[in-house]
Structures are given as structure tokens and as C-alpha cells.
Amino acid sequence: LTDAPQPVRLVTCSTAPNPRRVNAFLIEKGVEIPKEEIDLATRAHYDPAHLDKFGTHHLPALELSDGSTLTETMAICRYLEALHPEPNLMGATPLELGRIDQWNRRVEFMIMLPAAYVFRHSHPAMATLEVQEPVMSEWHRRPLAKGLEVVEARLRASPFLAGDRFTMADINAYIALDFMRVTKTRVPEDHTATLAWQASLADRPSLQRYVPPAA
């Protein structure tokens, strides 16, 4: 795909979970893209010029060499996988493609989404960005707990979420579980398979938390 438009700029906030997922993907691929870091508190991603360029405030946002753009985490990763097929992270066989997508979706809807609702409606840092409803926070803790049970059951049967090797599904799940810390939610102690899986990945360079450079 040498004639395909190439990435020229990634607008991101590397401390946030969705940008972290793309960053992890890039590190696993050994690919570097120039980054423009945004502080979410400044709301620079709501600037009219940004919205006109990308069509949404969602981060990360990828600009390509022909001027076209991509947003949404998995869309960006799928494009990058097509440009850089190895190491494969999104599926090498039809069944693996399906399983990785299946677990990506389960993690997003059963862990990442409810954790985001808990965070947005309970964390003091979000009070200036969200009309907080405490009942929303408490309600979403229940599906979040169920999502953790689903992941635990899978990891008791498989070394990784989508099978016998590390894939994008594991990147998504690891970062989703790490994001839960801001909601004061932890993986239960009796979820031994999940805790062992987390420990096995904890030193992986791609999964380290981003530390902003000192001012």
C-alpha cells in the first residue's frame, strides 16, 4: 500500500484512554507519527478550525498526506494495520479477525463505556465539562461489574482475550481496566485470571501510562 495516503499528524491527548489505545498500537507496530498534544481542559478540540478539519471533537484524530482524515480509535488502528501489516494485531485468519473484533466490541461496550459514564458523572475534574448526575454513575457500576465477570471467564479459558497470542483486544482491555482506576473501581481479588493476565502485561512498553513532559 505504498500509494496509500500516509499519516502526517495525530491530534491526541495521550493521557486519555482512546488516545492511549492508538499510542499502544503504534508502539507495538514500531511506527512513529508526529503528534499534536491537546489538553482536554482547554477544549482546543472544540475549536471551529479543528471541527471543520475533522468533523468531530473526538480524539485521537489522524490527518493523512492527501488531506483526508480519520477519527475513532479502531478506524485509525485498522488503517494503520493495512499500512503496516506486521506484527499483526487485528487478525491473520477469518476466525481470528472475527474473534478480535468480537472482544474489541465487548470490551468497549461492557467495560470502557460504563467506566466512562461512572467517571464523567462522579469525578470532580469532569464537573466543568459535564452536567453530572450521580445516579448515572451508580447505575453504570452494575454493567461494569458484569463486564469484568465476562472478561474473567474468558481469561480462565484462554491466555489472551482473542486466543493464544497478544492482539488489539488485549490492548483495549488492558487500557480499559487501567482507566477504571479513576472511577475507584478495581478488578475483584477473586478474578485471579484477569489479575494474572494484567500482571503478565504490566511491563509491556506499549501499555505504560503516558507522562507529560515537564513544563
Predicted regions and their residues:
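Terminal-tail/helix-coil boundary detector
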Residues: 210-215
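GST-like domain detector, emphasizing the conserved glutathione-binding G-site
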Residues: 1-138
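GST-like fold's C-terminal all-alpha helical module
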Residues: 2-3, 104-203
